[in-house]
Amino acid sequence: MEDAIYSFGTAHPGAITIKNFPDFLRNLTLPPDPATGIQQRLDLGAVDILRDRERGVPRYNEFRRQLRKEPVKDWNELAGGDVSLAKELETVYEGKLEDVDTMVGMFCEPLPEGFGFSDTAFRIFILMASRRLKSDRFFTTDYRKEIYTESGLEWVRRTGMKQIILRHHPGLEFAFQNVSNPFAPWCGRQ
């Protein structure tokens, strides 16, 4: 288990950006169908886009309008000034800027300074995270000593992710030297 956790902390997953969907997830080999024996391949990147379309997620420009953001006006703006990417997107979407899928558009957005994902994605993240926190009774009405105990609340107040990991996996202490934020990639030293 420590090896897996160490890998999560030191292996950089890559930026959440266009053309960075892991190749192995774009060409998954499924087990053979028991009835037919046929083995199929699956492109999870395409599945993500298809599911958004099936769920009725608006296309990128409409999504931006609904967030009160300006829609992109041309392919070059969408591609963040990358002329080659702009041409490729225009070809894929057959010149129809309004047809660009939301996920594709968000992956194309330039990242704000210090951000791990686009401004549009960040706005949705904030809305969803705050909604989940506000609707969880253990963070709201039941966040009290009668439920957690006073020592439990104290533990929550004083403990961070680094301490939680080390409490359960003390053998990883070497990996946390000079690590102030365990949610960022660790040093990777052994």
Predicted regions and their residues:
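Terminal regions of secretory-pathway proteins
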Residues: M1-Q190
